[in-house]
Regions:
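The feature represents the first ordered module of a protein
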Residues: 1-80
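Eukaryotic low-complexity, mixed-charge intrinsically disordered interaction/regulatory segments enriched
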Residues: 71-76, 83-86, 94-98
């Protein structure tokens, strides 16, 4: 599994692994329960390699955020999203100290940590963007 094959679909919980292209969109597999479904071409689908986080300087790719989280947690999952916004912001602030606190909302941090935990739980250890 590579990060370029992991997708977020608007309106659907969790992350999905790209399996194949279908006549009407994509066949994806949920990382939460392993079920496959058809994601229509009209769905808002984003590859995780296309997402970035606001910082005080240049925006950084989500792959770099995940790499820093992985190094900080030494390969373990991050804090549970049930621990509350204060704990998640503290964790995120340690991992990405220069994130833009005005443009990165609590929900963004919660989603990033949740996605990171899903990927680590699924066995992903490298969060690299493939060079083209």
């Amino acid at each position: 599994m590579e990060l370029k094959d992991v997708l977020a679909i608007s309106g659907q919980p969790g992350l999905f692994l790209y399996v194949a292209q279908s006549r009407n969109g994509f066949i994806v597999e949920s990382l939460l329960d392993g079920k496959r479904m058809n994601a229509s071409a009209s769905s808002r689908i984003s590859a995780l390699t296309e997402i970035s986080m606001f910082t005080e300087g240049e925006d950084i790719p989500l792959a770099e955020v995940f790499t820093k989280m992985y190094e900080y947690t030494k390969g373990e999952q991050g804090p549970s999203i049930k621990e509350g916004n204060a704990r998640l912001k503290e964790f995120f602030g340690v991992v990405i100290p220069d994130y833009d606190r005005e443009r990165v909302h609590d929900s963004d941090i919660k989603k990033a940590v949740s996605w990171f935990n899903m990927l680590v739980g699924a066995g992903m250890t490298k969060f690299e963007i493939p060079q083209e």
